[in-house]
Curated annotation (Swiss-Prot):
Protein name: Mo25-like protein
InterPro entries: ARM-like (IPR011989), ARM-type_fold (IPR016024), Mo25 (IPR013878)
GO molecular function annotations of the record: protein serine/threonine kinase activator activity
GO BP term, example: protein localization to medial cortex
Organism: Schizosaccharomyces pombe (strain 972 / ATCC 24843)
Recorded name of the encoding gene: pmo25
Family: Belongs to the Mo25 family.
GO CC, alphabetical: cell division site; cell tip; cytoplasm; cytosol; mitotic spindle pole body; new mitotic spindle pole body; non-growing cell tip; nucleus
Amino acid sequence: MSFLFNKRPKSTQDVVRCLCDNLPKLEINNDKKKSFEEVSKCLQNLRVSLCGTAEVEPDADLVSDLSFQIYQSNLPFLLVRYLPKLEFESKKDTGLIFSALLRRHVASRYPTVDYMLAHPQIFPVLVSYYRYQEVAFTAGSILRECSRHEALNEVLLNSRDFWTFFSLIQASSFDMASDAFSTFKSILLNHKSQVAEFISYHFDEFFKQYTVLLKSENYVTKRQSLKLLGEILLNRANRSVMTRYISSAENLKLMMILLRDKSKNIQFEAFHVFKLFVANPEKSEEVIEILRRNKSKLISYLSAFHTDRKNDEQFNDERAFVIKQIERL
């Protein structure tokens, strides 16, 4: 990293200009090596300037000047555009640079959020990178950082690209599918009121696609989706969503099937959704009918359900409550 301490260090303007000049050259065969070196050096410079080091905090005035140059030059878009062309360490630096920029605020303003709102074309590109392992994880880290901000999360939720996560989660690559699920979860849990409104408006389509995840043959997909469903339904902001979901006979039937899944972990997660149907004081007639029809089987099954969890007081209390409610039907 001697370039950071040479006799004539690049100014912030020089660093940004160097990146803007060299990033497009990564697609050109002639003299690629020199462009890779320049981009690598400048990204390291940028990362150290914005993030500091273990020993030195970033200089506030330098960060302010550098950020201004970054926005003025449209560098964030260029970094996303040419992300697949970057070398491994440069991709890591890019992720850290975006994280630092997105967390930077001036009073109550987040300048990078404003920039991203003005350039929404960045989001489809980032989501599309989940198709390519070499950039998926950097793109995912940037998307999750964006989802921390309500205004950017709204853009993600209301774009067509949000719906592609339902297929990305089922990718054949475990690592890529897990990362996509982490982003999906961040989008759905970070801003509860906003997400409640979104799910309410898109209720039928959302749960049509979500049910596919719950029926997945992939153990990890099924378990993660089931656990997330419980978190979504138990959010206070999602009360109307929960009420509508637990009024459905089809949803109840699915949970009863999952209660008997061969995996004990999936059984356990299914119980935490199933209990909502039973505890609902205003059950729909179709839900009551199914519970009554299966009353004796449910009581017998739940009486022996996960009895090895002797030290889990909350679970045992809830299981006893559910059994008692079914007995009263």
